[in-house]
C-alpha cells in the first residue's frame, strides 16, 4: 500500500529538519533501509550519468536512513571509479547498522590499497 513508491526513499521520514544535528538520527539508524526502498534507491543511483551525481544521489537518503554492510557494497558497485567507491565507503560507515560486517564492502573494491585507505579513514 505504498502510493508514492517512486520517490519514497528520498523522503526524510516526515521531518522538516535538514540541519546536520538531527536528534532522531540515532534511533533511525538501528534499522536498515527496507529491500523495496533499497531497490528504488539503487535504481535512482543507476539512472545518473555522471559519477558525482551518482555519489550525491547515494549520499542524500543516508542523512536519515541506514544500510547494512552488504547493501553498502552493492551501492559501491554502482560507481565506475575506485575513488568514488572509497569516498562512499568512508561516508557510509557511520550509517551502517552492522559495522562488524564492514569487511563485506571490500569485495566491491579493485585494489588492496583501497581497503587500507578506508580502514585508516574509519579508524580500524
Predicted regions and their residues:
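General marker for long, soluble alpha-helical cores
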Residues: 1-124
Amino acid at each position: 500500500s505504498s502510493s508514492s513508491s517512486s520517490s519514497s526513499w528520498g523522503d526524510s521520514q516526515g521531518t522538516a529538519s535538514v540541519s546536520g544535528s538531527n536528534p532522531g538520527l540515532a534511533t533511525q539508524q538501528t534499522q536498515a533501509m527496507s529491500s523495496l526502498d533499497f531497490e528504488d534507491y539503487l535504481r535512482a543511483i543507476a539512472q545518473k550519468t555522471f559519477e558525482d551525481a551518482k555519489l550525491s544521489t547515494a549520499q542524500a537518503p543516508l542523512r536519515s536512513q541506514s544500510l547494512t554492510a552488504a547493501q553498502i557494497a552493492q551501492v559501491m558497485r554502482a560507481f565506475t571509479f575506485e575513488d568514488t567507491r572509497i569516498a562512499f565507503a568512508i561516508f557510509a560507515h557511520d550509517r551502517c547498522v552492522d559495522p562488524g560486517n564492514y569487511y563485506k564492502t571490500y569485495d566491491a573494491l579493485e585494489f588492496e590499497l583501497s581497503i587500507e585507505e578506508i580502514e585508516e579513514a574509519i579508524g580500524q
